[in-house]
Amino acid sequence: LALANPVHAPYGRAAVTLLEHLGLLRRKDVPLPGLAKPFPLLSWEEIPWERLTGGVEAYWDATPLRQGKPRFAFVYGENISQTAQLALAATRVGLLALSLAVHESLSGAGAYWLASLGSHLPLEQDYLVLKGRGRPEVLAFYVYVGSPEARAVFRRYGFLLPGE
């Protein structure tokens, strides 16, 4: 199963929490030093993801995912785009961003299932200008991103926008 590495990739964290929500992963009672609560009692937002460097199966029991699949394994992408490539080329199944699943380059590659918003760690994305604030082309891009045309593009690729 291809998924983004949850240690540093937000989509990987959403994938793990989705599998947990569906009952396909169960948290192990493993000690994580320095935490106020035991690992199994932490909310998704409280999990110290950057400290979970042992791989998903060091912290979650994947027995439900293994049933009938003796060769089951997690394959980690460094980001969600690499995870999509792994799903296409190697695993044939993965947990991806909707924006990739509906993209023209993947549209004929298979089917996708849309998870409900409450079934995984939410992913909020922002944009900001780091350099060139005074340049006309930077300002034009900033204005475009908030325009009705750009909002239509975001919706087409599965993004929810503020107020939706």
Per-range role (PLM):
Residues L1-E164:
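Exported/periplasmic ABC-transporter solute-binding proteins
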